[in-house]
């Protein structure tokens, strides 16, 4: 099947793109075209106008500042994967990027495109949820910021309005001091090019990395493809906060996660399997993040 006929637009600035969105209510945005082309070819979307933002200036960058990390919406997955500056301060993000499909997709697919698609299996959606990111979006009327925990509304539905363009995603570094924070992304895929069966992001900050049993000051645990939207398990996080990590605590967290996730059954993974996988990934990811917070190797 081929896409239905449409009129193609290729703006060069964000202002031009938002003006087109304001003038063309039926228009859809195209970024790296790694998913949208498939959707169009199967006629799951038949817009009269397609706005290709791949040539829009100023949307492809990774800016690691003293207080904030900002990633432009048109930044390729490969850019994130190979960013040494990003790996030093938020290693969770490039670690997840390297597990997105294969090199061809990573060299074309974009961070903003993944977030805008809002597939619950998306790696970036999972990691950025754990990091309390916020998204900057723009329209012809101005810009606004959306906290990521308010961004995903339902399956493949976001808080971005039809006339808005995702500009960037930002993460405050305040909660993640490099010297005592560990991060881990864990994923299972049937093959390199497939979506994750399930993914997990863990972030752990300890009080004293040199102590025999460091106490966890802050913990984050989120999942990909474990519900209709990317899922963060706050109850599991609360269980480990204020305690040194132990095998007993990990088992308790695993039980909490098993009950908290709401996975959809798939051909190759039923609901029970995904629940068990989420519980296993919770243990594994938290344990590794805890070790990394102490400067220990896996």
Could you tell me what each predicted segment is?
Residues 1-298:
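C-terminal structural segment of proteins
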């Amino acid at each position: 099947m081929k896409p239905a006929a449409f009129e193609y637009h290729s703006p060069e600035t964000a202002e031009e793109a938002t003006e087109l969105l304001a003038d063309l209510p039926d228009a859809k945005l195209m970024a790296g075209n790694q998913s949208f082309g498939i959707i169009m070819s199967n006629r799951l979307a038949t817009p009269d106008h397609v706005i290709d933002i791949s040539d829009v200036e100023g949307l492809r960058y990774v800016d690691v500042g003293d207080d904030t990390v900002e990633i432009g919406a048109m930044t390729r997955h490969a850019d994130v994967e190979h960013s040494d500056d990003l790996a030093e301060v938020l290693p969770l993000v490039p670690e997840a990027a390297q597990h997105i499909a294969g090199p061809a997709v990573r060299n074309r697919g974009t961070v903003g495109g993944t977030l805008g698609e809002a597939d619950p299996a998306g790696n970036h959606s999972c990691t950025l949820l754990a990091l309390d990111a916020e998204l900057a979006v723009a329209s012809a009327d101005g810009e606004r910021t959306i906290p990521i925990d308010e961004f995903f509304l339902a399956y493949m539905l976001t808080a971005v309005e039809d006339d808005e363009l995702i500009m960037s995603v930002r993460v405050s570094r305040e909660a993640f001091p490099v010297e005592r924070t560990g991060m881990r992304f864990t994923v299972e895929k049937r093959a390199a090019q497939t979506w994750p069966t399930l993914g997990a992001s863990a972030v752990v900050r300890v009080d004293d990395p040199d102590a025999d049993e460091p106490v966890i000051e802050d913990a984050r645990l989120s999942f990909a493809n474990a519900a209709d939207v990317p899922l963060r398990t706050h109850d599991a996080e609360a269980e480990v906060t204020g305690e040194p990590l132990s095998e007993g605590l990990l088992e308790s967290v695993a039980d909490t996660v098993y009950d908290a996730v709401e996975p959809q059954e798939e051909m190759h993974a039923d609901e029970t399997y995904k629940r068990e996988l989420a519980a296993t990934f919770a243990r594994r990811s938290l344990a590794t993040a805890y070790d990394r917070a102490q400067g220990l190797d896996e």
